[in-house]
Curated annotation (Swiss-Prot):
Binds to actin and affects the structure of the cytoskeleton. At high concentrations, profilin prevents the polymerization of actin, whereas it enhances it at low concentrations. By binding to PIP2, it inhibits the formation of IP3 and DG. It comes from Acanthamoeba castellanii (Amoeba). This is Profilin-2. Occurs in many kinds of cells as a complex with monomeric actin in a 1:1 ratio. PANTHER family: PROFILIN. The modification N6,N6,N6-trimethyllysine is found at K104.
Amino acid sequence: MSWQTYVDTNLVGTGAVTQAAIIGHDGNTWATSAGFAVSPANGAALANAFKDATAIRSNGFELAGTRYVTIRADDRSVYGKKGSAGVITVKTSKAILIGVYNEKIQPGTAANVVEKLADYLIGQGF
């Protein structure tokens, strides 16, 4: 399965996230939903946050032109909020999954979808 298929089917296609991307640990985009562009600089900053979350805990982070307040940050997951919308990011051994949800979607529903896909990819060696 291609990275784009994971974005289109396993993330956005579930209805639990409205936009999604899969990026490498270097911040470069592997696949993305239409209209959602993560800059290499934002991607690299996010990747670094999994190693040291100090900066994003106090300053938040930006993805695709939206600034988020950090509500969770550890070596596996970084969650952000903007109003009642937010973003779930999960690191696997080779990639970072990003799922954005809007105010109509429950944060737990979005987190469940992104975290489960991450678990699957980790199980496949990714």
